[in-house]
């Protein structure tokens, strides 16, 4: 009986960690890439995409608010990320473990305002978009450092609100509203994308 209990504990302890978003996209769609759409020293907007008929289709639009100041042990990896590398993959390869304390969930209601986002996601018409926000913390030995606050806006072809909740569980502080915060964060990107479209059309 004791041996069986020990084996059960070993199996439980050896369960694989949750997939990174990049890993989940590749597993579901067969490919993965990241493209930085807009970035400065404070914030990065990026498309986490897979290829469909050779073209990138956004599965998650990620808005990353970087820690300020950036902790010294993270600066080298941070430069790679600012240059366009995947956040999760970069820190994982550098030996950091990743923790994602959840801040909250919400849904961006379907609206023509997000037309350019829908285009990136390959959607033909407006649709509700599941969003969630979390802190990205990095752990190595006795060190625990906060890197960023991240908001992820998911294509309904990838993750629905129900699926997001199943994957990430409940916020430790209880449900919170994130749609207003994410809407505000998206404003500069939407303006830039609209301007780019107008310039190309003109």
Segments (PLM) and residue ranges:
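Composition-driven recognition of glycine/serine/threonine/acidic- and proline-rich low-complexity segments
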Residues: 14-202
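Generic signature of intrinsically disordered, low-complexity, basic-rich segments
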Residues: 1-4, 58
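Bacterial Sec-dependent signal peptides at the C-terminal "C-region" and cleavage site
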Residues: 3-14
